[in-house]
Amino acid sequence: MKKFDKSIAAFEEAQDLMPGGVNSPVRAFKSVGMNPLFMERGKGSKVYDIDGNEYIDYVLSWGPLIHGHANNRVVEALKAVAEKGTSFGAPTEIENKLAKLVIERVPSIEIVRMVNSGTEATMSALRLARGYTGRNKILKFIGCYHGHGDSLLIKAGSGVATLGLPDSPGVPEGVAKNTITVAYNDLESVKYAFEQFGDDIACVIVEPVAGNMGVVPPQPGFLEGLREVTEQNGALLIFDEVMTGFRVAYNCGQGYYGVTPDLTCLGKVIGGGLPVGAYGGKAEIMRQVAPSGPIYQAGTLSGNPLAMAAGYETLVQLTPESYVEFERKAEMLEAGLRKAAEKHGIPHHINRAGSMIGIFFTDEPVINYDAAKSSNLEFFAAYYREMVEQGVFLPPSQFEGLFLSTAHSDADIEATIAAAEIAMSKLKA
């Protein structure tokens, strides 16, 4: 049995200092029934907690670390930038360098604005869509997470397409009423929503792959249908690629699925492990953003040289060949997990998109949030705890997917499959 004495003590102290002892809710490990692991360091595919335990890491800071921990080129770039100054409140050339890479690789982006988080990117994109179209309502999908902006913390009421109700105290009902929610992968509900409210829908915002349901890819024709419906009704299509951007493919989710939105939100990978976000799209739309246009958005640390340097060094190391290797590794891990579950007769469904993998303990195909919720959460929690004992660090939530990095070796994947085999053999009874 691993010892976690130092992590337990650190969490006890943290609970007197921060809400729930953490600075982001999922880090509290509540859904898996254990104390959070306090990390001390990471290198490559491995992380080490303050008790000295080593883990193969599939959290990767919730996706940004596509080259693993403490990537040499990223670290050296950060050192070089920090020695010259961490932030100036003025433009720097490194902003141009990262912006050029983003524009070259993302089909929808002609102009990009850097911000500090994925939430900031989606909030800004919604304001831009409303300002550009002169409309008020947005349409989002149940179970798709787009950050913690008021317009996006909304759950559905009854019916296939309803005006939303707040999903968190503090979200005004007046704000929520401008958010329409429908089921992910349900194109007919989208069409119905446009029949009811189409003249006032500014945009549809969607994750090309629903990452916060535990990895749920789009059904064939779904994204294409969204593109068609929005064009027919004069609404903008926004892809939230904070999670999928540069992870599922060299040209992001939109390149992977061959559907080009009007606006794209980015984050995670483009910061190389530092706080960052971005939104971009057609020049005609993006030129409405201040100071080119009247739609305001600003940020003290937006485009700061540390984040830009880390993002640039992260992206330049990604080539089309990188994604061929990601596909090979991800297929290997997916097949191994499936084989382990089948061997022990454990109900399961595995989804994958590029280097994102989600395993659900259910017989039901997982194509939307309701199906994701059918997973056996108690079994997942027990599986999670056993995987920790076996030295594998997974996202501590059923509704988060695994991420692979260029640093993961075949030996890492083989060890992970062996750990899953042990975990499932212990839990099958």
Swiss-Prot record:
Xref: SUPFAM superfamilies: PLP-dependent transferases (SSF53383)
EC number: 5.4.3.8
Cited CDD domains: OAT_like
Key words, A-Z: Cytoplasm, Isomerase, Porphyrin biosynthesis, Pyridoxal phosphate
GO MF annotations, alphabetized: glutamate-1-semialdehyde 2,1-aminomutase activity; pyridoxal phosphate binding; transaminase activity
Keyword rRNA-binding: no
Required cofactor(s): pyridoxal 5'-phosphate
GO cellular component: cytoplasm
Catalytic activity as recorded in UniProt: (S)-4-amino-5-oxopentanoate = 5-aminolevulinate
Pathway connected to this protein: Porphyrin-containing compound metabolism; protoporphyrin-IX biosynthesis; 5-aminolevulinate from L-glutamyl-tRNA(Glu): step 2/2
Location in the cell: Cytoplasm
A single BP term in Gene Ontology: protoporphyrinogen IX biosynthetic process
UniProt modified residues of type N6-(pyridoxal phosphate)lysine: 268
Gene3D superfamilies per the UniProt record, alphabetical: Aspartate Aminotransferase, domain 1, Type I PLP-dependent aspartate aminotransferase-like (Major domain)
Record HAMAP family: HemL_aminotrans_3
Family membership: Belongs to the class-III pyridoxal-phosphate-dependent aminotransferase family. HemL subfamily.
Subunit comment: Homodimer.
Name listed for the protein in its UniProt record: Glutamate-1-semialdehyde 2,1-aminomutase 2
Organism encoding this protein: Bacillus cereus (strain ATCC 10987 / NRS 248)
